[in-house]
Swiss-Prot record:
<keyword id="KW-0597">Phosphoprotein</keyword>
<dbReference type="GO" id="GO:0005871">
    <property type="term" value="C:kinesin complex"/>
</dbReference>
<keyword id="KW-0132">Cell division</keyword>
<keyword id="KW-0968">Cytoplasmic vesicle</keyword>
<feature type="compositionally biased region" description="Polar residues">
    <location>
        <begin position="204"/>
        <end position="214"/>
    </location>
</feature>
<comment type="similarity">
    <text>Belongs to the nudE family.</text>
</comment>
<keyword id="KW-0963">Cytoplasm</keyword>
<dbReference type="Pfam" id="PF04880">
    <property type="entry name" value="NUDE_C"/>
</dbReference>
<dbReference type="GO" id="GO:0001764">
    <property type="term" value="P:neuron migration"/>
</dbReference>
<feature type="lipid moiety-binding region" description="S-palmitoyl cysteine; by ZDHHC2, ZDHHC3 and ZDHHC7">
    <location>
        <position position="274"/>
    </location>
</feature>
<dbReference type="InterPro" id="IPR006964">
    <property type="entry name" value="NUDE_dom"/>
</dbReference>
<dbReference type="GO" id="GO:0016477">
    <property type="term" value="P:cell migration"/>
</dbReference>
<feature type="region of interest" description="Interaction with PAFAH1B1">
    <location>
        <begin position="88"/>
        <end position="156"/>
    </location>
</feature>
<dbReference type="GO" id="GO:0005813">
    <property type="term" value="C:centrosome"/>
</dbReference>
<feature type="region of interest" description="Disordered">
    <location>
        <begin position="181"/>
        <end position="246"/>
    </location>
</feature>
<dbReference type="InterPro" id="IPR033494">
    <property type="entry name" value="NUDE"/>
</dbReference>
<comment type="function">
    <text>Required for centrosome duplication and formation and function of the mitotic spindle. Essential for the development of the cerebral cortex. May regulate the production of neurons by controlling the orientation of the mitotic spindle during division of cortical neuronal progenitors of the proliferative ventricular zone of the brain. Orientation of the division plane perpendicular to the layers of the cortex gives rise to two proliferative neuronal progenitors whereas parallel orientation of the division plane yields one proliferative neuronal progenitor and a postmitotic neuron.</text>
</comment>
């Protein structure tokens, strides 16, 4: 368009101009065609390559789709499994929480039970200590009671021995009274006054024997010469040797034993005086007026000497025996 307004000086110049322009456009056309062919060839190659790539991409896409479908199926399966596991885990967690709550409650109960057991154990230990103390006290009292029983048994044995001795002395006194009565029947004494004096002396000795106060064992007199059984002393030593008695109980027991021994000694002295009385009256028997007096006694019932001596001795002996029995009973109860 720019060339249309151009002016040429000649036609040849214009023809050359147009020839050159035609050649230029022709060259451009050839170049353009060549470029077109190259572009077409490149396009075909590129198209083939694109088709190949497209096929590959489609194949890959199909593979990916199948893989995607498989993965989706797996995802669904995994989701289902996850839901199942989640629900199962939730149930397990709920069960574990319930178990934990129960365990905590059981733990609290066990702790409370342990505290109660500890308190009960403390109470039992205190009760055990109290029981042990009471048992020791009971054993001590039992041992004391056993010792007292042993001491009382020894005293009972001694009482029986003393009663046997008293009975023996009573038998001897009765025999002596019978012998004295026989001798008085056979012979009448010269002077009846000594007999009355001896009877009164015997009665006084018996009354003194019954009224002797309790004195300590250190003041006993004739008890050392009595035939006291050794078993009582051994029993007394054995009973008081393990656990000593209190001083008051020991002094009381010794006083009672000393009094009993003095009473027995007095009874033996009384019997000895009766024997001496019989032996003193035996050489002084006469036959004259004494026989008449004795017959008068048998007839009239006077018999003053024998009535004053023999019944009086029997009465004193019985009184001494009763007092001895009461004293032994009091000693047993006091010990």
């Amino acid at each position: 368009m720019e060339d249309s307004g151009k002016t040429f000086s000649s036609e040849e110049e214009e023809a050359n101009y147009w020839k050159d322009l035609a050649m230029t456009y022709k060259q451009r056309a050839e170049n353009t065609q060549e470029e077109l062919r190259e572009f077409q060839e490149g396009s075909r190659e590129y198209e083939a390559e694109l088709e190949t790539q497209l096929q590959q991409i489609e194949t890959r896409n199909r593979d990916l789709l199948s893989e995607n479908n498989r993965l989706r199926m797996e995802l669904e399966t995994i989701k289902e499994k996850f839901e199942v596991q989640h629900s199962e885990g939730y149930r397990q967690i709920s069960a574990l929480e319930d178990d934990l709550a129960q365990t905590k409650a059981i733990k609290d109960q066990l702790q409370k039970y342990i505290r109660e057991l500890e308190q009960a154990n403390d109470d039992l230990e205190r009760a055990k200590r109290a029981t042990i103390m009471s048992l020791e006290d009971f054993e001590q009292r039992l041992n004391q009671a056993i010792e007292r029983n042993a001491f009382l048994e020894s005293e009972l044995d001694e009482k029986e021995n003393l009663l046997e001795s008293v009975q023996r002395l009573k038998d001897e006194a009765r025999d002596l009274r019978q012998e004295l009565a026989v001798q008085q029947k056979q012979e009448k004494p010269r002077t009846p006054m000594p007999s009355s004096v001896e009877a009164e002396r015997t009665d006084t000795a018996v009354q003194a024997t019954g009224s002797v106060p309790s004195t300590p064992i250190a003041h006993r007199g004739p008890s050392s010469s009595l035939n006291t059984p050794g078993s009582f002393r051994r029993g007394l030593d054995d009973s008081t040797g393990g656990t000593p008695l209190t001083p008051a109980a020991r002094i009381s027991a010794l006083n009672i034993v000393g009094d009993l021994l003095r009473k027995v000694g007095a009874l033996e002295s009384k019997l000895a005086s009766c024997r001496n009385l019989v032996y003193d009256q035996s050489p002084n028997r006469t036959g004259g007026p004494a026989s008449g007096r004795s017959s008068k006694n048998r007839d009239g019932g006077e018999r003053r000497p024998s009535s004053t001596s023999v019944p009086l001795g029997d009465k004193g002996l019985d009184t001494s025996c009763r007092w001895l029995s009461k004293s032994t009973t009091r000693s047993s109860s006091s010990c």
